[in-house]
């Protein structure tokens, strides 16, 4: 009995001694394992010049692929394109040279029917020898040096329209206050619309717009005054998209207007005027004029 107790005491002492000797080794192994898992530079702040330090990734560069490059979105003013069936091309070539020379003196900006413009002209009877008019462009017509554009505004409840000659030497400045398009290429129906659609503040400030940005299209549809109108705008030959006909006409009147419809005209290829080759030749003339 005594021998067995002595043997058990001896075994327990040997086990305690072995655990005491292995404890430092376990601590060192645990510290090495933590150092390997976390890494020596996990929580250390390294300077920018220290090799192997943490470097933040570069900021992403967002490129809007929907934007059209400025070189591709070139604008050719419509008066440069000669009319169909021209008989004297030399006349239009001489006119274009004169037009380009005048544009070097007076820069004519890009604008469309529906854009809001401010035009400054020389007026010998005004106090400051100049006069200004702001309005919405409702029409562009003419070719060559005879090109014109019409502005409309409502002043003191009265609709006022002024037709300017685009290359008139009395024009001192053409400022685009708001560049935009409308659903139609002709806004003469604003004469028969409510005055609120033709009223603009004469002190309106220009709306900034990037050069590479596409021209916005204003899809506004106007409300008309009660009939009679200056023209039968509901007939299909005008192809008006910017009028709320449902508020001004009845179903019987709309059906009556559709009797004048000629659906075969849109398929008549002889009515199309392909100006692609003419525009390419015109751009060569314009680029040559800029270099000279």
UniProtKB/Swiss-Prot annotation:
SUPFAM superfamilies: Translation proteins SH3-like domain. It is found in: Mitochondrion. It holds the Pfam family Ribosomal_L19. Residues 41-60 are annotated as: Disordered. The modification Phosphoserine is found at residue 77. GO terms for molecular function: structural constituent of ribosome. InterPro entries: Ribosomal_bL19, Ribosomal_bL19_sf, Translation_prot_SH3-like_sf. It comes from the Eukaryota. Keywords: Mitochondrion, Phosphoprotein, Ribonucleoprotein, Ribosomal protein, Transit peptide. Gene3D superfamilies: 2.30.30.790. Transmembrane segments: none annotated. Belongs to the bacterial ribosomal protein bL19 family. Component of the mitochondrial ribosome large subunit (39S) which comprises a 16S rRNA and about 50 distinct proteins. This is Large ribosomal subunit protein bL19m. It comes from Mus musculus.
């Amino acid at each position: 009995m005594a021998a067995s107790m002595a043997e058990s005491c001896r075994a327990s002492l040997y086990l305690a001694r072995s655990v005491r000797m292995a404890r430092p080794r376990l601590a060192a192994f645990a510290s090495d394992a933590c150092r390997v898992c976390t890494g020596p530079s996990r929580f250390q702040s390294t300077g920018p010049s220290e090799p192997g330090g943490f470097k933040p990734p570069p900021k992403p560069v967002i490129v809007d692929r929907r934007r059209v490059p400025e070189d591709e979105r070139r604008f050719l003013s419509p008066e440069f394109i000669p009319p169909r069936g021209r008989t004297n091309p030399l006349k239009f070539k001489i006119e274009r040279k004169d037009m380009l020379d005048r544009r070097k003196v007076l820069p004519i900006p890009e604008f469309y029917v529906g854009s809001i413009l401010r035009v400054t002209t020389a007026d010998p009877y005004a106090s400051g020898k100049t006069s200004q008019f702001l309005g919405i462009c409702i029409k562009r017509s003419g070719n060559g040096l005879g090109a014109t554009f019409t502005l409309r505004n409502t002043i003191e409840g009265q609709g006022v329209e002024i037709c300017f000659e685009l290359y008139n030497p009395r024009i001192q400045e053409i400022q685009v206050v708001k560049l935009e398009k409308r659903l139609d290429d002709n806004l003469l129906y604003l004469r028969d619309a409510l005055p609120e659609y033709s009223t603009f503040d004469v002190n309106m400030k220009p709306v900034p717009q990037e050069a590479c940005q596409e021209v916005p299209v204003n899809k506004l549809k106007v409300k008309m005054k009660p009939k009679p109108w200056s023209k039968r705008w509901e007939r299909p030959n005008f192809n008006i998209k910017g009028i709320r006909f449902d508020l001004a006409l009845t179903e019987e009147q709309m059906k009556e207007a559709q009797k004048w419809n000629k659906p075969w005209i849109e398929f008549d290829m002889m009515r199309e005027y392909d100006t692609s080759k003419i525009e390419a030749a015109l751009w060569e003339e314009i680029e040559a004029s800029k270099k000279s």
